[in-house]
Amino acid sequence: MSPDDLSRLMPFLVLASALCLFALISIVLRLALIERSWPAIGRFVTARGVKAHVIEQGSGPEVLMVHGAASNGRELISALGHRLTDMRLIAPDRPGLGYSGRPKNAATLGEQAAFIADILRQTASGPVVAVGHSWGSGVILRLALDHPELVKALVLLAPASHPWQKSASWLNRIAGWPILGDLLVWTLPPLVGPKLAPKGIARGFAPGPVNPPDYGDKIGTPLFFRPKAYKANAEDMVIGSAEMGKQAVRYSSLTLPVTIVSGQGDVIVYNAIHAAGLKRDIPHATSFRVPEAGHMPHWVDPDLVEGIIRAHATDTVYEGSSAQFRAEP
């Protein structure tokens, strides 16, 4: 390239450099604002050699709450915490999400269950009622399989539990690549994610409206768009189906009380694969289907979920308080 060619290109190179610098500054400021707006509100313990962020509330019967994908420990405690004030709630951020660190091999359900087990050994005095939403259901199922002494009952909300056919999205696959993956997680999620979040939240609540309307702010959805959280979630998604398949063959060995709560209109996790699969593999499980709910049955009717948790905490059986919440056969 001749000096003349270089001089002609120089304005474009300067402009491109300025735009890249502006984008970088914008991303750093956005990430700082997210963490100022939704700071860590729990305490930190060490689990599997890394820091684990755990939100705790109250005293009484102990209830573990494990959130799903693209989320954090605020989700379940925001839905149910004000109802369960006479119980001790333990709501960790799963590995790499929220404010928890991510140990090696953390995408495997066995490692995530071991991470939760380490937390429980430091925060719980005995076996807990374990509540899991979506992906969190797969984690607490593995917890019950690998660490049965820590769990007295399972409450599975819109559970992800079995292998499925659809492959991981291209964004999730690329996020794990060297260099290009890092470039992706540092640009697209922080810049574009907050604009797309309302559509994703609406899909989770469909067929009903988003309720509460400020759901994203209440649970700190923007925390997911930080690079480390997005990358961690992507890693989970890429091997998730295979991981669920490995443990699904063991479900029939579970003997503890299990309750499944699914939404009739769930378009995120298909009931025919997961809720029905659990009922087939764990015949003694009790299963409830909420007619007007999608992927968020604990928000659509928290009365049902509260009743189930209280029943398990007191070793009784919840049979439903309303005709619309009939137990499935």
Model-derived features with residue positions:
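Alpha/beta-hydrolase fold catalytic core
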Residues: 1-61, 85-87, 126, 314-329
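Conserved alpha/beta-hydrolase catalytic His-Asp/Glu region
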Residues: 33-34, 189-253
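Conserved HGGG/HGGXW glycine-rich cap/lid loop of the alpha/beta-hydrolase fold
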Residues: 56-99
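Short beta-strand/loop motif that positions the catalytic acidic residue
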Residues: 254, 260-262
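Acidic catalytic loop of the alpha/beta-hydrolase fold
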Residues: 265-269
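Catalytic active-site module of serine/aspartate enzymes centered on a nucleophile-bearing elbow/loop
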Residues: 283-329
